[in-house]
Amino acid sequence: YKKKEFSPESTLILFEEPEAFLHPTQQEYLNSSLRALSAEDGQQVIISTHSPVFVSRNIEEISSVIKLKREKGVTKCFQVSEKARKNIIERNNEFVELLSSKLDDPFTNKKTKDRIRNILGDTEDGKRMEEEAIRYSLWLDLERASSFFAEIVLICEGATEKAFIDYLIRNEWIDLRERKIYVLDVMGKFNIHRYMNLFKELGIYHSILADRDENNNVHEIINQFIENNKNIYTKNIYFFDKKIEDFLGIPLPHRRDKRPLNVLWHYKNGKISKDKIYKLKRIIERLI
């Protein structure tokens, strides 16, 4: 009897939680090694992970990221297929199309049109679509990729809301920690719909917290667009009448980049009333 030689045409490597016992830099190195290995002929690598490092470093090939989610004893699978990825890009561009239509509308006032032109710039349609395709690879960095593992993501307009709410959850609102919330700064209201579209495909529940910016026609357009963009994974939306500083009853700093520091300074120095903090917590509880 002659033993047959085993010479498979392909090799499947299964790796459970490769991040175990590795600090982030080592995880980065291992991820690069696994990607290089999977690029070889006849090699396929499948990993299971709870590490944002492995998620963020594979966003450019987001179709290779599969999210498993258990609900009421049933495990569901979510994946952004290539078709879904293209649909996300097209849906993201709907806001540009909406603004462009307002430019052609004779009932849109000059001030609003000037603001829209400033937002749109002179980017050509083809290039704009290409830019949409790479936005997530730029934005879903190591920190933001943590949103993939949250029970619910609180999408905030800017860094001020994120910094303050994160601080309160870590230090004051102990009961909210158990809700496994991730507070996401999307770097401006004009990006909120992009994350809503992505989270829909990945089955990630989310709520939105933003400024209404009253008496601003362009913001009225985007506010309504966000409302209309709700999907089955969008829980709730709340708009402050103006800015969070107005809600908290504190002044705005002279520089925009000082806003997160400004809010935290006023809070730590007892300049924000307990009633305001209570009302803010009630808003967050309704959102999640």
What is the meaning of each model-derived region?
Residues 95-155, 159-288:
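Acidic, Mg2+-coordinating catalytic modules of nucleic-acid enzymes
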Residues 1-136, 142, 220:
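Switch/communication elements of ASCE P-loop NTPase nucleotide-binding domains
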